[in-house]
């Protein structure tokens, strides 16, 4: 995929998901990529993943994480000097499963996240890839961020509520 992007003149990508591909992806054999790298002429900004306290990796996604998880992980990324925090998002995520009305739980989560980022502009810079200057690629990768198991439990309860009433 990265080679095809490079041949097409696309120099940035964010499709690498360590919670799915991990160390066997072929991007950096034997390493779980969590920080931007250069591979096949493309600067890969991997989706942010974290250990959810159960030993499993989970990707940062508006519908897959609670607001509390996202806020906490953003602060941890800042504290540990991570160069990027990439959140997976799909255009349909603000809709319910039937895709016929807004999913109020996710809409509220999105608004809270936007408000948090707006209040903390001095700490977090939100930007697209357009005009981004690639950093020197890391050949060593830090361990994924970690979220406590109680946040995972809170997310599971929130997701159960969302599926039942969302």
Regions found by a protein language model. Give the residues of each.
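C-terminal domain-boundary segment and adjacent tail
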Residues: 12, 64-166
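Active-site-adjacent pocket scaffolds in enzyme catalytic domains
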Residues: 1-80
